[in-house]
């Protein structure tokens, strides 16, 4: 009579120290860990238990078992053992040494740049799509060595500027400069070197930023529509050719708020939101006044209000 072979249970064994008994199942991170030496033993495991939901109660331990998402642009983010920074100086030094040894020079530079992008964007409440787009642009630049020797902060700032334009949520050079503490001139230099190698680039128009500036100034939708129409008319006439979009937007908003006394804003308020100086707003506004009857839509504003516009 044919006998069945004896069943041999699967035993996890640490390949580093040979431990078989003290194998810990780490469900939060999804793998088995050797309790003696700390090395990862097996592949990722799945916890088949019920999932918990966390509602952000700071008084209790967060029950979420899911770690942070891995970055697809970093090759080093894979299954490995990391030394925690802990609370002591020794653990911090060991963690720093391990990070240097586990990542090659280019990977460390890539990770540093991506960390800066994430920090700057999250501080300014930019969306995740913009962060991912900036990561993608930065990785391409680093791999192709387009800006070798340039300041990392300048490259990061230019990547964020480009990502905002590509995702149709444009920011001005001044706004990116304030966000990253990088000079506007440096951002412009990096942008000029990167732009020829880009596949697509949305145009930076005044209409794109007027809506955001009006929202920051708590202006109603009517003011926003009139300001947008004036900006379009000024662009078609070419009366402000050579002026930056943020300067035109600031002057147009100042003009429209003067048409409606209940919505009037002083130049300092507009300067604070748009990062455009009062002198620039005043000079651009004076140039717009010359064409006020051509650019202000009469079907939305009566002629008397246009006649009463101040000269400065």
Swiss-Prot record:
The similarity comment for this entry is:
Belongs to the TFIIB family.
**Which compartments does it reside in?**
Nucleus
The record's subunit annotation is: Associates with TFIID-IIA (DA complex) to form TFIID-IIA-IIB (DAB-complex) which is then recognized by polymerase II.
Zinc finger annotations (TFIIB-type) as residue ranges = 10-42
Q: Which CDD domains match?
A: CYCLIN_TFIIB_rpt1, CYCLIN_TFIIB_rpt2
Record-annotated residues binding Zn(2+)?
Answer: 14, 17, 34, 37
User: Any idea which GO molecular function terms this record carries?
Assistant: RNA polymerase II general transcription initiation factor activity; TBP-class protein binding; zinc ion binding
Q: Which GO terms describe its cellular component?
A: nucleus; transcription preinitiation complex
Which keywords appear in this protein's UniProt record, sorted alphabetically? Metal-binding, Nucleus, Repeat, Transcription, Transcription regulation, Zinc, Zinc-finger
| UniProt key word Metal-binding | yes
Please state what the protein is called.
Transcription initiation factor IIB
Can you say where the sequence repeats lie in this chain? 120-196, 213-290
Q: Note the SMART domains from the entry.
A: CYCLIN
